[in-house]
């Protein structure tokens, strides 16, 4: 150990410290990325008996084929049922330990605490979910106050602790306190639960037992597919067997679906083929997500790549460390084997060498804790990560790091220790192991392996970034660069719904008078996002499904949609509709076609069952024109049938402005703020989005991970460069005499540099051949979620290889320049 400490400040100390720093940096990157990976892979695993807690889906191939004809984004699995079918499921199997239905009657509501004098206080926005009474037997709630028995009274609600603090302050007790809901009357607090972790499908909302009347209505409803079912299977129950049992026991269930699936809740997160469309409840797009219970999807490919990068960074750093250890063998081998000649035993010598590796790895791990602590304290990666990086929240990640700390010294110290002591002492003392073929091949093999791994990451990232560039720059069929969207908060939008003209008309009029604005309009959905309203309407005797955008009469000219036939809206065209070409081709539509909206009435019989009775349909709209197809949603969805429909007094959510020039955006925003303050008296707080802003929000997960992958890729490349730096340093020292002799026989400095560079370029070429197909496969896995994608150009691979080659050549040239410039006489005589 004395020799070890002395060597820290020897000529080889710089390489040691560089290696130690690289390993420490790898630990930091591993911790940050792996914490995020663990956040995803442990999604909804906090439930008791998590493997038996399932969400129920069904498949119906005929329905899927029909729906995909009109909606390409319709998925294979569907999770929303009619209440009647859910009752059939519950009545036809005994394989559920417990089960509850969640009725889609939720509304974003205001909940007002009632004070001691019976006066309502400041309301708080929340969401109410109505369920059947087995909720707490399926999901695991951490009840802080109250008793789940109180849930059996539909006058009680259970709320999260965060909402209790907003309603009543941070001092309890809360149970028994009264609140007034704007859509469901007075309720009592029956219990308070600890907020769910962020990696859960379950939202921190208000849960209330559905009234018997509401349950009866849903149980008898065969038509409205808006309800969901969550179950806990009995021990030993198999989802496939339960599905077969249901199909055998009920003709209604056989008619409804081809099969039923019981997917563990922790697996639902990574499902990409599940439809939740009927659960949309409109809420602010930018600052909130659409309220869809359980609609949180993770991209398994991106998470897998992120985990791969985290491990590769550490693995590459470990290889670097092994390579450095092997490069030090020629400096250790003679000293160790001289000791063997004088009687030293192998085991103590090997243990002495391994102690150095143990101390190095422990030092690197300890050193990494400082930047990790700094990152946690300053919340540096909050914009990129979902995970909480605090040490107490990442036990699995810390255990993984501990495993590396234990295993790495065994490999990095064990192999060189065995290698140094495995030769006959006499041969070692008389020979020169510095340039032995075995040692050289091993070092180059490790470097090649490092570069193969890092090039896989770099090439994959290059392809990912090409698709990202495409998302921002591809033609979308309207003038995205000139569009500025102002979002009206939901609360104010609801307030002005019945008096739209008192806010919208003065606002639009003022905007049109500004010379920096070419046109202004409004709509109920933003363009370029995944959220759009769907309609099923009757036309020519058939029910047609299409996306619909409710707009002002001048919307098409504002956004730049181009007519192909017919005319644009006029202020008198109430309920006029303009369809895209996809709709015309699929449905054979023509100008003048009329659409009708089906209407139903629910009649309750003496037993309390509801029957849905059709009523005469009402006119929904008529076609006045057709327009070119445009990417009105995100690039994950194919262009589907879509209509713009002009309707007054609708729920206005977005003011849409066409700028005279993109550079005038800030000027226009200031003007809109001034007008908004005057018209709404400061009650409306507009949120502004450009076209690129909406793209960023739509692909926020992908873009966050791409940023993380970018930094990870940089480090996976830098760490092998450190290895190249050390290896060239070693080889130039070991080959000083060879270089001198070559120069005596006429070799030039340029020739020497080319010799060194060609060795590494050949290695890089082999690495590229191996890495390119792997990167191609990884990219294809990710790109499958996009209906529209950029072509995979060959030159992307060439450019990536060229950049890597240039950086490596610069590193090799800089490091070997001094040796190549030395005078031959000096190098030969030394």
Predicted regions span which residues?
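Generic structural signal for small/hydrophobic residues in well-ordered secondary structure
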Residues: 19, 40, 56-58, 89-90, ...
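Intracellular coupling helices
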Residues: 2-10, 14, 18, 317-360, ...
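Structured, solvent-exposed hinge/loop segments at the ends of secondary-structure elements
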Residues: 30, 34-173, 181-186, 251, ...
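Short, strongly hydrophobic transmembrane alpha-helices
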Residues: 11-41, 51, 440-467, 478, ...
């Amino acid at each position: 150990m004395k020799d070890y400490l002395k060597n820290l400040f020897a000529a080889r100390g710089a390489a040691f410290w560089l290696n130690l720093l690289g390993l420490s940096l790898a630990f930091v990157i591993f911790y940050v990325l792996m914490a995020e990976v663990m956040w995803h892979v442990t999604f909804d695993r906090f439930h008791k008996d998590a493997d038996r807690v399932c969400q129920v889906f069904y498949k119906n191939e005929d329905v899927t084929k029909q729906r995909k004809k009109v909606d390409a984004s319709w998925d294979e699995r569907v999770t929303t049922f009619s209440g009647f079918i859910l009752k059939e499921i519950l009545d036809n199997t005994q394989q559920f330990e417990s089960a509850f239905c969640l009725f889609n009657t939720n509304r974003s509501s205001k909940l007002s605490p009632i004070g001691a004098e019976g006066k309502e206080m400041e309301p708080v926005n929340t969401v109410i979910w109505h369920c059947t009474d087995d909720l707490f037997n399926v999901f695991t709630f951490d009840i802080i106050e109250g008793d789940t028995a109180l849930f059996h009274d539909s006058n009680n609600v259970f709320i999260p602790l965060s909402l209790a603090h907003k309603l009543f302050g941070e001092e309890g007790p809360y149970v028994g306190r009264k609140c007034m809901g704007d859509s469901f009357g007075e309720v009592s607090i029956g219990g308070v639960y600890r907020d769910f972790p962020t990696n859960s499908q379950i939202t921190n909302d208000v849960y209330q037992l559905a009234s018997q009347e509401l349950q009866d209505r849903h149980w008898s409803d065969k038509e409205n597919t808006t309800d969901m079912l969550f179950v806990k299977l009995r021990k030993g129950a198999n989802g496939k067997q339960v599905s077969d049992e249901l199909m055998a026991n009920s003709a209604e269930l056989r008619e409804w679906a081809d099969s039923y699936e019981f997917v563990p809740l922790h697996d639902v997160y990574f499902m990409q083929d599940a439809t939740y469309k009927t659960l949309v409840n409109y809420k602010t797009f930018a600052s909130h997500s659409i309220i869809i219970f359980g609609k949180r999807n993770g991209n398994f490919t991106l998470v897998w790549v992120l985990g791969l990068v985290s491990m590769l960074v550490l693995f590459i750093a470990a290889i670097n460390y092994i390579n450095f250890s092997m490069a030090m063998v020629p400096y250790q081998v003679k000293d160790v084997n001289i000791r063997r000649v004088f009687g030293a035993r192998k085991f103590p010598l090997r243990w002495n060498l391994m102690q150095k590796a143990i101390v190095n790895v422990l030092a690197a791990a300890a050193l990494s804790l400082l930047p990790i602590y700094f990152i946690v304290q300053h919340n540096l990666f909050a914009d990129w990560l979902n995970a909480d990086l605090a040490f107490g929240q990442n036990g699995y990640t810390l255990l993984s790091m501990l495993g590396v700390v234990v295993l790495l010294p065994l490999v990095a110290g064990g192999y060189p220790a065995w290698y140094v002591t495995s030769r006959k002492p006499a041969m070692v003392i008389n020979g020169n192991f510095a340039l032995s073929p075995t040692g050289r091949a091993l070092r180059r093999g490790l470097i090649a392996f490092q570069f193969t791994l890092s090039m896989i990451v770099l090439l994959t990232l290059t392809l990912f970034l090409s698709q990202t560039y495409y998302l921002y720059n591809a033609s979308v069929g309207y003038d995205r660069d000139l569009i500025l969207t102002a979002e009206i908060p939901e609360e104010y939008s609801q307030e002005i719904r019945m008096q739209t003209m008192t806010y919208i008309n003065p606002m639009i009029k003022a905007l049109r008078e500004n010379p920096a604005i070419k046109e202004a309009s409004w709509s109920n959905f933003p363009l370029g996002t995944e959220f759009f309203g769907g309609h099923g309407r009757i036309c020519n005797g058939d029910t047609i499904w299409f996306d619909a955008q409710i707009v002002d009469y001048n919307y098409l000219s504002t956004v730049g949609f181009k007519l192909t036939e017919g005319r644009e809206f006029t202020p008198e065209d109430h309920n006029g509709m303009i369809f895209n070409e996809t709709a015309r081709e699929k449905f054979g539509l023509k100008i003048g076609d009329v659409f009708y909206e089906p209407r139903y009435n629910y009649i309750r019989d003496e037993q309390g069952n509801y029957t849905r009775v059709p009523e005469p349909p009402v006119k929904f709209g008529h076609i006045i024109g057709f327009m070119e197809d445009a990417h009105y949603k995100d690039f994950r969805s194919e262009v589907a049938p879509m209509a713009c429909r002009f309707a007054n007094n609708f729920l206005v959510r977005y003011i849409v402005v066409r700028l005279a020039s993109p550079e005038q955006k800030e000027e226009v925003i200031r003007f809109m703020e001034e007008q908004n303050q005057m018209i709404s008296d400061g009650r409306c707080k507009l949120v502004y989005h450009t076209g690129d802003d909406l793209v960023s929000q739509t692909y926020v997960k992908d873009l966050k991970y791409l940023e993380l992958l970018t930094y990870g890729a940089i480090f996976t490349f830098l760490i092998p460069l450190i290895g190249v730096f050390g290896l060239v340093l070693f080889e130039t020292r070991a080959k000083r005499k060879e270089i001198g002799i070559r120069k005596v026989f006429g070799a030039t400095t340029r020739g020497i540099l080319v010799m060194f560079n060609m060795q590494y370029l050949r290695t890089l070429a082999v690495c590229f051949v191996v890495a390119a197909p792997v990167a191609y496969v990884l990219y294809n896995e990710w790109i499958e979620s996009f209906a529209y994608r950029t072509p995979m150009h060959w030159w992307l691979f060439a450019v990536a290889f060229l950049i890597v080659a240039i950086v490596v050549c610069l590193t090799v040239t800089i490091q070997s320049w001094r040796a190549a410039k030395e005078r031959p006489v000096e190098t030969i005589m030394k």
